[in-house]
Amino acid sequence: MMRTISEEALQRLREAFPVGCRVELDYMNDAYNRKLTSGSKGTVKHIDDIGTIFVSWDCGSGLGVAYGEDSCHRIDE
């Protein structure tokens, strides 16, 4: 189910995950994903207008973290 994000929540998300920050995947709800697992790390490339966090994952994947479906957290590296 696609979830919507308010302008305020989108702004908070963009502040919490600025371009270039490092993230670690907690959970991804994608039955076809074979590369990413919990603990995968990557670099934020951008966040679109529906709140998807696009990441350049260290494993080579470019899958986005979908707002309200998937989960990641910022890490300091």
Report residues per predicted region.
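Basic/aromatic-rich interaction segments and small domains that mediate binding to polyanionic partners
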Residues: 2-14, 18-77
